[in-house]
Amino acid sequence: MKASELREKSVEELNTELLGLLREQFNLRMQHATGQLTQTNQLKLVRRNIARVKTIITSKAGA
């Protein structure tokens, strides 16, 4: 997900997106722990998307 797409969303939409990403991260971690995860790069992508969303939420709260 691109940061420019995230900047267009409201804070409520970003919080919803963040919850979805956190759930996805949890599921990926469980799959990784049980050896079912084949694309381990997904963990990295989700972690970075979480950071993007949190950064934009913080910048909107400060503005």
UniProtKB/Swiss-Prot annotation:
Keywords tagged on the record: Ribonucleoprotein, Ribosomal protein
Xref: SUPFAM superfamilies: Ribosomal protein L29 (L29p)
Chain coiled-coil ranges: none
Pfam families: Ribosomal_L29 (PF00831)
GO terms (BP aspect): translation
One GO CC annotation: cytosolic large ribosomal subunit
CDD domains: Ribosomal_L29_HIP
Domain of life: Bacteria
GO molecular function, one term: structural constituent of ribosome
PANTHER family reported in the protein's UniProt record: 60S RIBOSOMAL PROTEIN L35/50S RIBOSOMAL PROTEIN L29 (PTHR10916), LARGE RIBOSOMAL SUBUNIT PROTEIN UL29C (PTHR10916:SF0)
Family to which the UniProt record says this protein belongs: Belongs to the universal ribosomal protein uL29 family.
Record NCBIfam families: L29
Protein name: Large ribosomal subunit protein uL29
UniProt organism field: Shewanella denitrificans (strain OS217 / ATCC BAA-1090 / DSM 15013)
Gene transcribed to yield this protein: rpmC
